[in-house]
From Swiss-Prot:
Organism domain of life: Bacteria
Example GO molecular function: tRNA binding
Similarity comment: family membership: Belongs to the universal ribosomal protein uS13 family.
Name of this chain's protein: Small ribosomal subunit protein uS13
Gene Ontology cellular-component annotations: cytosol; small ribosomal subunit
Lineage: Bacteria, Pseudomonadati, Myxococcota, Myxococcia, Myxococcales
HAMAP family reported for this sequence: Ribosomal_uS13
Length: 128
């Protein structure tokens, strides 16, 4: 099993698909990586030679930010927006949609489950 960027790639899938198991690599970047590393995209992961795995690993390390580094950069970017106090930062802080979507209806994913109506407790019956 090939291990690239701390991720075990599935053996039976084509390398083009296997690379997409790494956070930060999608279809397009997987194709570009394989093109730069001179590896056929239809090769199965189990059929890769050690040299091909090394070339893929080096290409990813040099050209693409993946896994922990990418996650860290994204969280720092969001934190920076919140520290600035700009509109996008405030929306992140409040847990609301950031990109201009409506919130009167919808946006349940960002806002969380509905807060139910809290009704007053029924008043006890007056004593006779």
């Amino acid at each position: 099993m090939a291990r690239i960027a701390g991720v075990d790639l599935p053996r039976e899938k084509r390398i083009e698909v296997s690379l997409q198991y790494i956070y930060g690599i999608g279809k397009t970047s997987a194709k570009l990586i394989l093109e730069r590393a001179n590896v056929s995209p239809v090769t199965r992961t189990k059929d890769l030679t050690d040299d091909e795995v090394r070339r893929i690993r080096e290409t990813i390390e040099q050209n693409v930010k993946v896994e922990g580094d990418l996650r860290r950069e994204i969280s720092l970017n969001v934190k920076r927006l919140m520290d600035l106090g700009c509109y996008r930062g405030l929306r992140h802080r409040k847990g609301l949609p950031v990109r201009g979507q409506r919130t009167h209806t919808n946006a349940r994913t960002r806002k969380g489950p509905k807060k139910g109506l809290v009704r007053k407790a029924a008043a006890p019956a007056p004593k006779a």
